C-alpha cells in the first residue's frame, strides 16, 4: 500500500473534490463566483498538466450568484451532475441553499460538454444548507448535507447538523416522509465545538460517504468545530445497517478520527475515491 503524500496544487483550492472517470482525474473546488473543473490524465504534475475549465457562471444578482461553495462532480444514472451551495449577494451567508447543475452524458468529458442550471433540489425545505454530497446505498440515492436546525428560526449560525434525505432522482427529493430531511448528527461532543465572541459554535459539515473496498465498512467522515480555528478536525459516523433514514443507523465515533498536533498543519476536509494509482485511501486535504 502506498502511503506517500503528494501535493497536487500550489494555489488555493478550498473544499476539493476529485473523481477518476474515462481515464482522467477531475478536480472541483470552491472558486467563489463560478464552478471550475480541472482535468488531467495524471496526478504527477497535476496543476501543470490540468486543463482548467469554467463550466458555469451564474447570472449576476440572482439568488444563487454569490459564495458558490464546495462543488461536487458526480456521475449518476448516466449523466454528470454538480452539486453546490450558493447564496444571494444581498442576503449573504444566511441565504445559502443547495443547487444542482446538469451536464453531458457520463461517458463524455465533463469539461467539454454543455451544462445547464437545474435549480435547487426540488422538495428540499427552505433551510440554510451547504456541503451536499450524494451516494447510493441499498439501491437508493441519498443526499447528506450540513444545515441549520430545521425546528428553529435562529440564524446565529451557532449550530450546524448533518441531515440525510432520500432522492427520487438526482434533482428531486423522494415523495412522502422518506424525502424529508432527518438529522443524523448533532454536535454533542466537546471536540465538535469552537468558541468565539459570538458564543459556542457546534459545527458538523463537509460530509463524505466512504466504503471500504470489500464493503465491510461504510460510514460518513465529516469535519467538525470551527474551520477558522486550530480545533478543526475530522470525525466519523459509522453506518451500522438498516434504514439509512434512521438516525440510529449512524452511531458517532467517541473521539476524532484526525486532528491537528502542535504544528502549523491540520486536517480540514476529507475526500476519498477509488483511484488507479493510490487506491481508495487517497486523501486530499482542504
Which residues does each predicted region cover?
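Carbohydrate-active catalytic/glycan-binding domains of CAZyme proteins
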Residues: 1-286
Amino acid at each position: 500500500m502506498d502511503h506517500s503524500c503528494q501535493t497536487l496544487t500550489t494555489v488555493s483550492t478550498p473544499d476539493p473534490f476529485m473523481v477518476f472517470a474515462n481515464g482522467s482525474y477531475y478536480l472541483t473546488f470552491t472558486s467563489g463566483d463560478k464552478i471550475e473543473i480541472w482535468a488531467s490524465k495524471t496526478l504527477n504534475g497535476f496543476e501543470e498538466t490540468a486543463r482548467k475549465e469554467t463550466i458555469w457562471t451564474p447570472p449576476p444578482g440572482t439568488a444563487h450568484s454569490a459564495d458558490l461553495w464546495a462543488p461536487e462532480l458526480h456521475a449518476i444514472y448516466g449523466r454528470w451532475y454538480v452539486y453546490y451551495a450558493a447564496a444571494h449577494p444581498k442576503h449573504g451567508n444566511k441565504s445559502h441553499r443547495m443547487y444542482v447543475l446538469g451536464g453531458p452524458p457520463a461517458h463524455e468529458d465533463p469539461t467539454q460538454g454543455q451544462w445547464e442550471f437545474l435549480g435547487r433540489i426540488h422538495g428540499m425545505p427552505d433551510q440554510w444548507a451547504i456541503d451536499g454530497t450524494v451516494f447510493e446505498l441499498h439501491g437508493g440515492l441519498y443526499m447528506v448535507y450540513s444545515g441549520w436546525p430545521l425546528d428553529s428560526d435562529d440564524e446565529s449560525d451557532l449550530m450546524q447538523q448533518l441531515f440525510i434525505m432520500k432522492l427520487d432522482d438526482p434533482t428531486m427529493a423522494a415523495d412522502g416522509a422518506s424525502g424529508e430531511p432527518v438529522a443524523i448528527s448533532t454536535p454533542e461532543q466537546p471536540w465538535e465545538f469552537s468558541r468565539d465572541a459570538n458564543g459556542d459554535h457546534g459545527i458538523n459539515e463537509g460530509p463524505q460517504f466512504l466504503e471500504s473496498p470489500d464493503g465491510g465498512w461504510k460510514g460518513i467522515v465529516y469535519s467538525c468545530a470551527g474551520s477558522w480555528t486550530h480545533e478543526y478536525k475530522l470525525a466519523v459516523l459509522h453506518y451500522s445497517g438498516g434504514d439509512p433514514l434512521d438516525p440510529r443507523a449512524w452511531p458517532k465515533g467517541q473521539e476524532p478520527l484526525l486532528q491537528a498536533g502542535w504544528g502549523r498543519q491540520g486536517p480540514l476536509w476529507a475526500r476519498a475515491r477509488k483511484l488507479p494509482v493510490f487506491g481508495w485511501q487517497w486523501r486530499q486535504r482542504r
